[in-house]
Amino acid sequence: MSTKTNVVEVLNKQVANWNVLYVKLHNYHWYVTGPHFFTLHEKFEEFYNEAGTYIDELAERILALEGKPLATMKEYLATSSVNEGTSKESAEEMVQTLVNDYSALIQELKEGMEVAGEAGDATSADMLLAIHTTLEQHVWMLSAFLK
């Protein structure tokens, strides 16, 4: 049976993931080059703004559950399943990496929804579902870009 502690762990994993993605998306926004520069530069900015919103919402939910959100880069990097960007990726590699990262997060969010549901925490489950829904659309659009 899942508990509030399990839900906080799930949410903190996502706080870590989104903080690493926030930095990675800035990296991509600054270092993207090539014929798709204008499109991707703008899209990466949209994505990092979205990431910032998720970070705040997830951290505040953890606080509402009387937990402690992760709050240092060291903690984020140790906990995240997302890797940092290198500043050396091509535009296509950046997009493919985001497809991979978002796909991995979709799976983690599904698992997190189950944990929250078992703990009777419909609010956290709903929050994770909303992020999941958005990421499925992002994966579809980014994958279409790569074709």
Curated annotation (Swiss-Prot):
Coiled-coil portions: none
Subcellular location: Cytoplasm
Top EC class for this record: oxidoreductase
Main location: cytoplasm
Name of one Pfam family that matches: Ferritin
Catalytic activity: 2 Fe(2+) + H2O2 + 2 H(+) = 2 Fe(3+) + 2 H2O
Superkingdom field: Bacteria
Keyword Zinc: no
Ligand binding (Fe cation 1): H29, D56, E60
Residues where Fe cation 2 binds: E60
GO molecular function: ferric iron binding; oxidoreductase activity, acting on metal ions
Gene Ontology CC annotations of this record: cytoplasm
Record-stated family: Belongs to the Dps family.
Domain writeup: 12 di-nuclear ferroxidase centers are located at the interfaces between subunits related by 2-fold symmetry axes.
Quaternary structure and interacting proteins, as annotated: The 12 subunits form a hollow sphere into which the mineral iron core of up to 500 Fe(3+) can be deposited. Homododecamer.
Function: Protects DNA from oxidative damage by sequestering intracellular Fe(2+) ion and storing it in the form of Fe(3+) oxyhydroxide mineral. One hydrogen peroxide oxidizes two Fe(2+) ions, which prevents hydroxyl radical production by the Fenton Fe(2+) ion. It is capable of binding and sequestering Fe(2+) ion. Does not bind DNA.
Protein name: DNA protection during starvation protein 1
Source species of the chain: Bacillus anthracis
